[in-house]
């Protein structure tokens, strides 16, 4: 429950953000995600099997480890890289996704970029911060 806000507050924030054309990004381990309408939700494959409720209007991205990510039934594979440490790979993926999405609002391109960021991250030990020169 780290950093979690109440479901009613999450709904209010999501609805207000939609009115203001502000995207909402969610990375939650909660099984009830229905309080995040209009959000772009990122969960991993293990978490996806436990989800009990989703909002009415949402985009769902499921990360599937070395197989990449799935969105709208489309698999976006990653590059085959030598993996040293997966710690922080999901966070690196979502940070890369958000960065790319805020630049051009294209989910497909953003997932591809996020996959490349995660691939760079896992080639390093620990929670690696991807730098511009890594790209």
Predicted regions and their residues:
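Ribokinase/PfkB-type carbohydrate-kinase core domain
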Residues: 1-79, 86, 102-107, 111-116, ...
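Short glycine/threonine-rich catalytic loop with a Thr-x-Gly-x-Asp
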Residues: 79-97
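Buried hydrophobic packing segments
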Residues: 97-98, 118
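Short alpha-helical functional segments enriched in proximate histidine and acidic residues
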Residues: 121
């Amino acid at each position: 429950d780290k950093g979690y806000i109440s479901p009613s507050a999450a709904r209010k924030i999501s609805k207000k953000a939609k009115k203001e054309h502000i995207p909402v990004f969610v990375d939650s381990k909660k099984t009830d995600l229905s309080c995040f309408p209009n959000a772009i939700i990122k969960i991993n494959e293990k978490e996806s099997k436990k989800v009990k409720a989703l909002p009415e209007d949402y985009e769902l991205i499921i990360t599937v480890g070395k197989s990449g990510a799935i969105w709208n039934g489309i698999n976006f594979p990653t590059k085959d890289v030598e993996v040293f440490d997966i710690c922080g790979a999901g966070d690196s993926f979502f940070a890369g996704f958000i960065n790319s999405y805020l630049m051009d609002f294209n989910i497909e391109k953003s997932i591809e970029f996020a996959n490349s960021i995660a691939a760079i991250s896992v080639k390093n030990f620990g929670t690696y911060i991807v730098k511009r020169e890594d790209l």
